[in-house]
Amino acid sequence: MDVGSKEVLMESPPDYSAAPRGRFGIPCCPVHLKRLLIVVVVVVLVVVVIVGALLMGLHMSQKHTEMVLEMSIGAPEAQQHLARSGHLVTTATFSFGSTGLVVYDYQRLLIAYKPAPGTWCYIMKTAPESIPSLEALTRKVQNFQAKPAVPTSKLDQVEGRDAGSAPSRGDLAFLGMAVSTLCGEVPLYYI
């Protein structure tokens, strides 16, 4: 055996892979484009993971809410209890900015509006299918205020207490607790 043949055996085997060892290579792309492509892929993967986690959390929250509602209302005795105490959740009170207070009484189908100075109170009867929004109520009150005022005694005689009339103090029982609390001490006007 000669010395030259030993050297041939000590050499490393040839590399048949497409990319050099230890380097990820994309053929025919400059280095800065390769780095940009890697950054874009990493950012997209991070966004996909975050959106997936948020959607899973939203799904779990929705399922939990549905389960709690089903447990609280689903039982027959719970439905009977809600039917018996239905009058407890029939009013909604909204602060109308600094201009006043609005009370919706869904059981009696009454809406009461008291302006902030508190000198009068407007009461409106509604139908169950056409309960006005706060904006519609504001327009109606503003239209009522823009009309010329007719003395209430004339209204009581002619129209039998129609729009714009003021009731006597004995009529407050039909208004309910929330509306009579809001409007108990000031003159009432029916719109």
From Swiss-Prot:
User: Pro-peptide positions?
Assistant: 1-23, 59-191
Keywords, ordered alphabetically: Disulfide bond, Gaseous exchange, Lipoprotein, Palmitate, Secreted, Surface film
Q: Which InterPro entries match?
A: BRICHOS_dom, SP-C, SP-C_palmitoylation_site, Surfactant_protein_propep
What does UniProt give as GO cellular component?
A: alveolar lamellar body; extracellular space
Taken from the UniProt record, the cysteine pairs bridged by disulfide bonds within this chain are C121-C183
For the lipid attachment S-palmitoyl cysteine, which residues are annotated? Answer: C28, C29
Quote the function comment for this protein.
Pulmonary surfactant associated proteins promote alveolar stability by lowering the surface tension at the air-liquid interface in the peripheral air spaces.
The record's section on PANTHER family has: PULMONARY SURFACTANT-ASSOCIATED PROTEIN C (PTHR10800:SF4)
The name under which this protein is listed is: Surfactant protein C
Q: Which source organism does the UniProt entry give? A: Macaca mulatta
What broad taxonomic lineage does this protein's source fall under?
Eukaryota, Metazoa, Chordata, Craniata, Vertebrata
